[in-house]
């Protein structure tokens, strides 16, 4: 039935009246009281505020001029507020208001491939994040009943780690060692190796130089899958407050994917600098110092952070969040305060030794001090069987090698152990960005156990490792799980002597030709290293994708 003009006008009036009523319902009919605080003093990124007795711990406070901070400690008369922006414009008597909200960070797929600060603000020159999803940076760790056993391996592609110190999905494995021993390199190799997996990687940089972060981003863009990585960066030049919240923000970003049944990996580089920042803030806010001037809650701060890494039960989607925190030691002192705290919190540690690093063993993993407490249950059965005696044989070799410095060996059995140990050391010495598949690792270890590698020079192990994947692919049919056929793998390991002879012949031919091929390869490697080390020290934006892809390795 067609409406008359009068009926149409009445309907429009009714809609207008409904809109006006809705608008008026939001209008306060009486003055609204809002607590207003004042800055008493400000220095070193900390503002002491009075007049906000009802403020909550970790609540976001806003200063006149737009600067924000969060309540760090609550006293009777003053609140210490950690500033998240440069404190320019914040001075005594500046007005401060509450927001009633806690710190949150944007989360979601829109962050993949981006470089952001702990508040989600882009640092890569890209567009602002188009996501409305946020999570608090402080979230409770999953309860015991919500967790499941760690049963799946997180493949790093590094033979010594996968074979001896397996990391499981949902595990917390500490990477610890002196300065410049390859801690970040080992963690980045683990990230790069996820380029063919279903793991989302989050790299958190705390207090690092912008040039160092730039090199990490370039390495991931060049060798890994940057479209499945997120970089949360709080460089050394930013406010201490941003450095303090960075690891918590990184975990929240990763938990978004874990809670949806996916798998995530968080690398925190590094918690030693985070502990120093926490000590700095505590001393500035007059908290009582404890051992090594750290406040008494430093253990709790790191424990509540790392406990958020977990393997969730199937009822909650079965997702996992693995953590690779990094810590720095001073002169190899693992008994210092922060290292002992982190070792007791995590599920194991990979200890890097400066003497091994100086001896050109990369990664410089100390086999005697490293351990993985839960990852062994997640190790692939074929790899577990192949690496059964590896640790014992290598430990015996290191002990025998120390004695051989005082004289020669006449016992044939001891000479055989030395020979085997030299091949083991050559196997576990692995260049960066040369990840091995689990299949490659199993065949190499089986060939080692069968004595196939004993007759070859240790110098030929590296070219053998490079040519092994294509050799295996040509001889193995592509079933769904080629690691299940143990008999076929054992036969391949025993017949690898064919490849060994070919590698030895090629090496002899190059030596006869004057080593031109090696010189050319060294020149190319030096060019890549020089390109990798270059860059603006003040910018952390990655290099353009076109330049990064030009040197990308062939995918296997």
From Swiss-Prot:
Among the entry's GO cellular component annotations, what is one?
proton-transporting ATP synthase complex
The record lists the catalysed reaction(s) as:
ATP + H2O + 4 H(+)(in) = ADP + phosphate + 5 H(+)(out)
EC number(s) in its UniProt entry? 7.1.2.2
Q: Which UniProt keywords apply?
A: ATP synthesis, ATP-binding, Cell inner membrane, Cell membrane, CF(1), Hydrogen ion transport, Ion transport, Membrane, Nucleotide-binding, Translocase, Transport
CDD domains (alphabetical):
ATP-synt_F1_alpha_C, ATP-synt_F1_alpha_N, F1-ATPase_alpha_CD
| UniProt site positions, description: Required for activity | 370
An example of a GO molecular function for this protein is: proton-transporting ATP synthase activity, rotational mechanism
Q: Where is this region: Disordered?
A: 514-556
Task: Indicate the segments annotated as coiled coil, or none if absent.
Answer: none
How would you describe this protein's topology in the membrane?
Answer: Peripheral membrane protein
| Location(s), subcellular | Cell inner membrane
What residue spans carry the Low complexity bias annotation? Answer: 546-556
Q: Where ATP is bound, by residue?
A: 177-184
Q: Tell me the SUPFAM superfamilies matching this sequence.
A: C-terminal domain of alpha and beta subunits of F1 ATP synthase, N-terminal domain of alpha and beta subunits of F1 ATP synthase, P-loop containing nucleoside triphosphate hydrolases
How does this chain assemble? F-type ATPases have 2 components, CF(1) - the catalytic core - and CF(0) - the membrane proton channel. CF(1) has five subunits: alpha(3), beta(3), gamma(1), delta(1), epsilon(1). CF(0) has three main subunits: a(1), b(2) and c(9-12). The alpha and beta chains form an alternating ring which encloses part of the gamma chain. CF(1) is attached to CF(0) by a central stalk formed by the gamma and epsilon chains, while a peripheral stalk is formed by the delta and b chains.
The record's function comment reads:
Produces ATP from ADP in the presence of a proton gradient across the membrane. The alpha chain is a regulatory subunit.
Family that this chain belongs to: Belongs to the ATPase alpha/beta chains family.
Name of the protein described by the UniProt record: ATP synthase subunit alpha 2
Organism whose genome encodes this protein: Burkholderia thailandensis (strain ATCC 700388 / DSM 13276 / CCUG 48851 / CIP 106301 / E264)
